[in-house]
Amino acid sequence: MIQPPIGKKVLVEVPSTTANLGPGFDCLGAALSLTNFFTIKRIDGDSERFELIMESTEGNHLRGGPENLFYRAAQRVWKAAEVEPFALEARVKLAVPPARGLGSSATAIVAGLVGANALINDPLSKEKLLELAIDIEGHPDNVVPSLLGGLCFTAKAASQRWRVVKCDWDDSIKAVVAIPSLRLSTSEARRVMPKTVPLGDAVMNLGSLTLLLNGLRTGRQDLITDGMHDRLHEPYRWKLIKGGAQVCEAAINAGAFGCAISGAGPSILALCKEDKGRNISQAMVKAWESEGVASRAPLLNLQTKGSTWYSNQSK
């Protein structure tokens, strides 16, 4: 397959994601209406040249070079499509802050895969991109909804194949995501978790997940409230998030159906009806402020379309 001409570029939009939603550890994730934008261009130079230009204050510590996560994803596309690697430039506008539990690394992986594939005229199927994304990230709960959009349940079947189920999400349900100035790496959040859990905790999580999925499908508040309880990861992770329990309590008192750590944290997800969103947002920000932590708490929708790309001529 022939390399694209120097100067060819595409714009890739990739949504943020919230993973786990309480009981769905490492298998449930949803795309949200907070989006990163990547303008990707083939440039002249050595095949390992990767120029990263940040057009926002978020992520200004990130660097280019061949070890960059975005560029590593692009290289996986070229290898699968049997294309010789080429130099790239990526201009990035980040709305999804790194190390906050909103799938920032997943947006980089998905943008690298989708953008590199688009530059060489989309030879790889979405199914192949999905396989590559999970392999790079190591778990599916962020990259799958980031690529496909919506609420996604992903599991490795007994056949060792990844199976993805798009789940229904009632339009009346909105998400308030409180994003603190704190940072928390996924590796740190995983280190505090035990290698085994009591059988009763595992059974409780199965029940909670079933209630949550049915509540999200029907919009029933009682099912969401009872379903957003977890015993596999949250009991061990709350201690890493300063003021997290108080923020969650404030959201519930302001009218949220339920609360959960977003991904590995430290951001906190609250599900609610739209008319409660503003009060919940203010309550969560105030609760963190009382702990000396600055934050913001946007009211977000489910993003259903997933990642999309546009040619330079069309956008």
From Swiss-Prot:
Secretion signal span: none
Enzyme Commission numbers on file: 2.7.1.39
Main subcellular location: cytoplasm
Swiss-Prot/TrEMBL keywords: Amino-acid biosynthesis, ATP-binding, Cytoplasm, Kinase, Nucleotide-binding, Threonine biosynthesis, Transferase
InterPro entries in alphabetical order: GHMP_kinase_C_dom, GHMP_kinase_C_sf, GHMP_kinase_N_dom, GHMP_knse_ATP-bd_CS, Homoserine_kinase, Ribosomal_Su5_D2-typ_SF, Ribsml_uS5_D2-typ_fold_subgr
Pathway assigned to this chain's UniProt record: Amino-acid biosynthesis; L-threonine biosynthesis; L-threonine from L-aspartate: step 4/5
GO BP: threonine biosynthetic process
Molecular-function GO term, any one: homoserine kinase activity
Compartments in which it is found: Cytoplasm
Pfam families assigned to the protein according to its UniProt record, in alphabetical order: GHMP_kinases_C (PF08544), GHMP_kinases_N (PF00288)
Gene Ontology cellular component terms for the protein in this record: cytoplasm
Chain sites annotated for binding ATP: 97-107
PROSITE patterns xref list: GHMP_KINASES_ATP (PS00627)
Catalytic reactions on record: L-homoserine + ATP = O-phospho-L-homoserine + ADP + H(+)
NCBIfam families assigned: PRK01212.1-4 (NF002288), thrB (TIGR00191)
Annotated function: Catalyzes the ATP-dependent phosphorylation of L-homoserine to L-homoserine phosphate.
Protein name: Homoserine kinase
Gene name for this UniProt entry: thrB
